[in-house]
């Protein structure tokens, strides 16, 4: 399985791919253009080469605001190609995603609606403490199937369907990080 990222992508992507078991040899770094954006033609070529060599493209990770240069990958073109090729598309908007709250910066996310998941970090621009992140997913059921476990001691007595956020990530529990962002929005508004 191959993971495709821009050569400008954040190092956490490589770390995550290693943790997920892909191995560094399956992380394909796609060249960037003069604006530090992923070269879509190079991406298409690498995917075609890998398919011809018997590899399976699993995921493309596009970046909306690279940490080192602020580069913005052409999400619309990348999303269209991922849809054609049936490849999962994740958008790493950790650094610049908070700017999407402002109408004048929403052009950056053109094409992001074609992504399967997107993450941004309010702690970088929106006055929240460290580790406040927002993660959008198109298909929550796929995420839940990945992380869900239900040993006897976690079974509840309710017959009413509830959302168990323990099934949305590796830890079974976590701090209420969303409260940080809620307080900022309540205190300062969205305008």
Task: Describe the residue ranges of each PLM region.
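Structural motif of enzymes handling amino- and sulfur-group chemistry
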Residues: 125, 134-138, 161-191
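Conserved core segment of the aminotransferase class I/II
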Residues: 137-163
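Short, mixed-charge, low-aromatic patches
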Residues: 2-5, 158-166
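Short, functionally important structural connectors and interaction interfaces within domains
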Residues: 104-107, 117, 146, 162-164, ...
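Conserved PLP-enzyme active-site core in the AAT-like
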Residues: 1-142
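A generic structural signal for well-ordered coil/turn residues at beta-strand boundaries
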Residues: 114, 131, 148-150, 166, ...
């Amino acid at each position: 399985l191959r993971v495709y990222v821009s050569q400008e992508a954040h190092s956490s992507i490589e770390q995550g791919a290693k943790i997920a078991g892909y191995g560094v040899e399956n992380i394909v770094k796609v060249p960037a253009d003069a604006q530090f954006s992923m070269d879509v033609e190079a991406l298409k070529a690498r995917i075609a080469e890998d398919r011809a060599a018997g590899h399976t493209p699993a995921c493309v990770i596009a970046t909306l605001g690279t940490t080192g240069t602020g580069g913005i990958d052409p999400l619309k073109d990348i999303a269209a190609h991922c849809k054609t090729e049936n490849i999962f598309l994740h958008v790493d908007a950790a650094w610049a995603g908070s700017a999407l709250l402002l109408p004048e910066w929403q052009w950056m996310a053109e094409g992001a609606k074609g992504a399967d998941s997107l993450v941004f970090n309010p702690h970088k621009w929106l006055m929240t403490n460290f580790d406040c992140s927002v993660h959008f997913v198109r298909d929550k059921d796929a995420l839940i199937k990945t992380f869900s476990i239900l040993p006897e001691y976690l079974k509840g007595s309710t017959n009413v369907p509830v959302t168990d956020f323990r099934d949305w990530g590796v830890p079974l529990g976590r701090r209420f990080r969303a409260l940080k962002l809620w307080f900022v929005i309540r205190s300062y508004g969205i305008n």
